[in-house]
Swiss-Prot record:
<keyword id="KW-0878">Amphibian defense peptide</keyword>
<keyword id="KW-0044">Antibiotic</keyword>
<keyword id="KW-0964">Secreted</keyword>
<dbReference type="GO" id="GO:0005576">
    <property type="term" value="C:extracellular region"/>
</dbReference>
<protein>
    <recommendedName>
        <fullName>Antimicrobial peptide 3</fullName>
    </recommendedName>
</protein>
<comment type="similarity">
    <text>Belongs to the gastrin/cholecystokinin family.</text>
</comment>
<keyword id="KW-0929">Antimicrobial</keyword>
<dbReference type="GO" id="GO:0050829">
    <property type="term" value="P:defense response to Gram-negative bacterium"/>
</dbReference>
<dbReference type="GO" id="GO:0050830">
    <property type="term" value="P:defense response to Gram-positive bacterium"/>
</dbReference>
<comment type="function">
    <text>Has antibacterial activity against Gram-positive bacterium S.aureus and Gram-negative bacterium E.coli, when in combination with XT1 and XT6.</text>
</comment>
C-alpha cells in the first residue's frame, strides 16, 4: 500500500543519508 511504499522510500533515504554522513567523499 501507500504507507508501505513511503516507509520503504524513507528507509532507503535515511540509510543513504547516514552512509553519506558517515563516509563523506
Amino acid at each position: 500500500g501507500l504507507a508501505s511504499t513511503l516507509g520503504s522510500f524513507l528507509g532507503k533515504f535515511a540509510k543513504g543519508g547516514a552512509q553519506a554522513f558517515l563516509q563523506p567523499k
